[in-house]
Amino acid sequence: MSIAAKEIHLLHYPDGVPTTEDFAVRDSALPNPLDGEVLIENIWMSVDPYMRGRMTKRKSYIPPFELNAPLEGHAIGRVMQSRDPRFAEGSLVTSMTGWSSHALLERDYLHPIPDMPDIPPEKFLGVLGMPGMTAGVGLNRIAYC
């Protein structure tokens, strides 16, 4: 049984401010997970400043997004099916995945979100995620604040 997924593709590199015409929603189908794989349903996706720099052909510290393919970014998802004992169905994970409603990933590309009742899970895409780490390094290692 395959899982129907929706993906957001970059159609062409924007000239100036990105518009809806630069993107398209496409259908895809994911197979059931094999040993060591986990099927997740993405709940939150992060839209970060570095992504605009990847919407160009210019060389940078990270490769540009591929055209006619899902954009990539950090996400939080709920495990739907798991073929790995470390990831229970229903648990929350973070990953770097395509902009898609669902993703099939190997266990090494997933990180469990700890159960912290007072902290909303989406904070792991902001202050407790890559943007927060970037800010911390910038303040503590570069600016010496």
Describe the predicted segments one by one.
Residues 18-29:
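Short glycine/threonine/proline-enriched tight-turn/helix- or strand-capping micro-motif at secondary-structure
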Residues 3-8:
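Short structural boundary motif marking the start of a folded domain
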